[in-house]
C-alpha cells in the first residue's frame, strides 16, 4: 500500500473522528432550544467556515465562482441540499427507531448508496467488477457493511441491557425515515462527484491538491444551509414553545457559553469534511468513490470508541462490549482490504 493511500485512509479516519465527536459540545448547551443551538452551529459550519477558507485559498474569490455555468453549480448545490434533508431526517430516525437501529439502518444505506451509485452514474461499475483491484475494493465495502451491522447489534444489546428505548418507537415510520435518511445523506458523495470541475479549476489556479475540494464547499454546504436553517427558522417562528428572542434574553454569561459551545460543535462538524477533502485528494481517481465508504464506516468505528472512552458502555455488560470490539475490528479490516485493492 502506497504512502499516499495510507495517508488518504488516515485523513478519512481523522475526519470521521471529528464527526463522531462534534455533538459533544452541543450537549453542554443550556436552556436553549435545539433549533437555536443548531442554527448557531450551522451558520459557523455551513456558511462562515466554507466562505472564509475559500477566500484564503482562492486568488480571486468571485472570479472563481462566476467562471462556472449554472449547469455546473446547480447539481452541486442541489446535492448539498439533498444532504441537508438527510441531516434533518437523521434526528427523526433516532426518535422513532432508537440510536442503534436508527444508525445501523441509516448508515448502512448511505454507505451502500453513496459508495456504489457514484461509479454507476459515471459508467465505471463494470470496470470495478472486471479488475482485481476493483473487486478487492468492493469486497472491502461489503466487509465494512458487515462491520456496521455488528456494531449496530452491539448497540441493540447495550440498549436492551440498560433499558434504553426509542423516544416514540414506531417501526413503520422509523424505517421509512431511516431509508430516506440513508439515501439523502449520500448527497455529499454525489455533490463531491458533481463538483469535480470545481476541483480541477481550483487546481489550475495553483491551489494545493489537498485543498482543491474546499472551495466547492461554499456551494455544497450552501445547499445544506438552506435546508437546515430554513427548517430551524420555520420552527422557531411557528412553534409556540420556541423563541429565538427568549433564548437570547438569558444571562449574558450563559449566552456567551452557549454561543462558544455551539460554535465549537459547528467547527468540529466542518472539520469532518475538511479532512474528508484531504483524504479524498489522496485516494486514486479511479477509486474516489471509496472515500464515502471510508468516511461512514470510520464514523461508526469512532462513534463506538468515543462511547467507550466516555464510559457510555460501563453498565452494558461484557457481551455488548465484546460485540462492539468485534465490529470495530471488522471495520478496520475492511479499511485495509480497500487499501490493498486501491494499491492494485
Curated annotation (Swiss-Prot):
It comes from the Bacteria. It is found in: Cell inner membrane. One of its GO terms (molecular function) is symporter activity. It catalyses: L-rhamnopyranose(in) + H(+)(in) = L-rhamnopyranose(out) + H(+)(out). InterPro entries: L-rhamnose-proton_sym_RhaT (IPR004673). Keywords: Cell inner membrane, Cell membrane, Membrane, Sugar transport, Symport, Transmembrane, Transmembrane helix, Transport. It is a multi-pass membrane protein. GO terms for cellular component: plasma membrane. The chain crosses the membrane at residues 4-24, 38-58, 68-88, 101-121, 137-157, 175-195, 214-234, 259-279, 290-310, 323-343. Belongs to the L-rhamnose transporter (TC 2.A.7.6) family. Uptake of L-rhamnose across the cytoplasmic membrane with the concomitant transport of protons into the cell (symport system). This is L-rhamnose-proton symporter. It comes from Escherichia coli O9:H4 (strain HS). The gene is rhaT.
